[in-house]
Every structure is written in C-alpha cells, then in structure tokens.
Amino acid sequence: MATPTENETGLNDALENESFSISIRRDEIIAVDITLSTEVNLSFQYEKLFATLRSLPQNCTTVNLFLASFGGYMQGLVPLFNAFKYCQVPVDVYVTGECYSAGAMLALSGRSLTMMPNTMLMFHNSSGGEFGKGNELYDAVMHGTKHTRGVFKNMVTPFLSNAELEGLMHDKDTYIHWDQPDLQKRIRRHFNPKKEVKK
C-alpha cells in the first residue's frame, strides 16, 4: 500500500488500498476522484475512505465516484452507500464497467448517475446463510428478509419500480443497459423526483 503525503488542505494527494483509490485534483476548485473497481469488501477496509469523506475541505465542490464493481458484501455496501449518499460534498457517480449486485446498488448512492457506453447494471437478491438453533434460525431468516427488503427499497427505488423490487425479492434479476430507452427517465425519477413530470 502506498504511503500518502499530506498537503496544505489536510487531504492526501493519493490514497489507495486493494479496495479503492482516491486522487485529489487541484485547480481553482478541488475535486476528489474515487475509483472502486473490485468487489465491495467488508466495511473496515474503507475506514480511510470514510475519514477522507468526512474531512473534505470547504473548497472541495465535487466527489467523482468511478465504479466498476462485480458485487460484494452487504455489510460493506450499507456504510459505503451511506457515506456517499450523505457526504457533505455532492457525489457524482460514473459507471465505467459492468456493475453487479452491491456494485449496481452503489451506483445509486450519489446525486447523479452517468453510465458510460457499453456498461450495465444488474440488480438481484442477496445471498447468504445462517446457523444456530431451530427458533434462532427461523428468527434470523425472517428478520434478515425484512431487513433486506427495507435496505433494497431505500436504495434502489424509485430507480427500479415497485414491481421490479418485488421481482428482486423473489429472485428475478433486473438488468439496466447504458443505451436502453428508459434509462434517462429512471435517472430523473431517482435523482430529481420533484422535477419528474407525471403523465
């Protein structure tokens, strides 16, 4: 892992590990570029990223997230999604490659979404397992299913319709391609719901 150097802003010029990389661009306006091109890992691997997002200087006006992730852990997805969604500086998301599962959900965490040519999002239900005694297993499955539904609803609607959300919960995958006719309508509906005109 590279050792970052400090500068007058208190941010690092470069910061990276196996899960992400950050670069700081200095013009008159500071922009932060973040690249996530691996699976979404467990949240402890993003502690420096979280710290960076919490300590952005006042003259930083944009965070650019470049995303090409093939999925990963929900335990890492939730804090990552929240870090971008509620960042004090607006986050613009650029999908640069295929994004599956947790990667697709992370694409909806910013203030805007741009899908580059030949890219795709694939949404599907979560997978996992439980172990324990009989009633504990039952409770874990019931509460886990309820929690997953709530997380999915909060993250993917209204980009995905309620019918598509129900499909996800019943293991029907949903694919969104960069050139499909309704993509811009989905983006407006999700990121600018007040501006979406109902017909």
Residue ranges of model-derived segments:
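Intrinsic disorder/low-complexity segments enriched in polar/small residues
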Residues: 7-9, 29, 196-199
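Charged, glycine-interspersed solvent-exposed loop segments at helix/strand-loop junctions
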Residues: 63, 130-199
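Cleft-lining beta-strand/loop regions that shape enzyme active-site pockets
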Residues: 17, 21-131, 135
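TOPRIM fold recognition
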Residues: 2-5, 125, 197-198
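Acidic/proline-rich low-complexity IDRs
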Residues: 10, 14, 35, 39-41, ...
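Intrinsically disordered, low-complexity segments enriched in small/flexible residues
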Residues: 1-21
